[in-house]
């Protein structure tokens, strides 16, 4: 019991000292820095050029979908790499688990493909127009 308490005490001291150093560094920098704001320092810096337009730019949702799909398969590689390094020691059950894991991700990729999220240039949809009722003459 005493050994466990001393181990947790070391972790607590480490966290406490880390917090003290971070807060102390922040406060020291805040107290010692010069504060001389002027319009030139407060202006938006954009690669050495004057800013044009606003910074609120609307991005197409396809950027986010492609980024999420990339992150999902990047994380898959992170999970499968340790499995691949010790594959012979784990046996058939681990192989089946890895295949199920990859299969679930492949089903998700197929769903995104069928839905059209992987098509960068989408064709314009052909929406049939509804016939308009005749207008009454006044």
From Swiss-Prot:
Pfam families per UniProt: Oxidored_q4 (PF00507)
Membrane topology term: Multi-pass membrane protein
Key words of the record: Cell inner membrane, Cell membrane, Membrane, NAD, Quinone, Translocase, Transmembrane, Transmembrane helix, Transport
Subcellular location as annotated: Cell inner membrane
Cellular compartments per GO CC: NADH dehydrogenase complex; plasma membrane
EC number: 7.1.1.-
TM stretches of this protein: 8-28, 63-83, 93-113
Function: NDH-1 shuttles electrons from NADH, via FMN and iron-sulfur (Fe-S) centers, to quinones in the respiratory chain. The immediate electron acceptor for the enzyme in this species is believed to be a menaquinone. Couples the redox reaction to proton translocation (for every two electrons transferred, four hydrogen ions are translocated across the cytoplasmic membrane), and thus conserves the redox energy in a proton gradient.
HAMAP family hit by this protein: NDH1_NuoA
Record's subunit section: NDH-1 is composed of 14 different subunits. Subunits NuoA, H, J, K, L, M, N constitute the membrane sector of the complex.
Record protein name field: NADH-quinone oxidoreductase subunit A
Taxon lineage: Bacteria, Pseudomonadati, Chlorobiota, Chlorobiia, Chlorobiales
């Amino acid at each position: 019991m005493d050994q466990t308490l001393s181990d947790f005490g070391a972790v607590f001291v480490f966290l406490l000292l880390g917090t003290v150093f971070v807060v102390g560094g922040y406060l020291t920098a805040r107290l010692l820095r010069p504060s001389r704001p002027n319009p030139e320092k407060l202006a938006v810096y954009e690669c050495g050029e004057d800013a044009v337009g606003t910074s609120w730019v609307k991005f197409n949702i396809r950027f986010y979908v492609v980024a999420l799909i990339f992150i999902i398969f990047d994380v898959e590689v992170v999970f499968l790499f340790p499995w691949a390094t010790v594959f012979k020691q784990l046996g058939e059950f681990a192989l089946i688990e890895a295949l199920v894991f990859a299969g679930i991700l492949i089903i998700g990729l197929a769903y995104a493909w069928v839905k059209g999220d992987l098509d960068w240039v989408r064709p314009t949809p052909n929406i049939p127009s509804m016939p308009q009722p005749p207008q009454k003459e006044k």
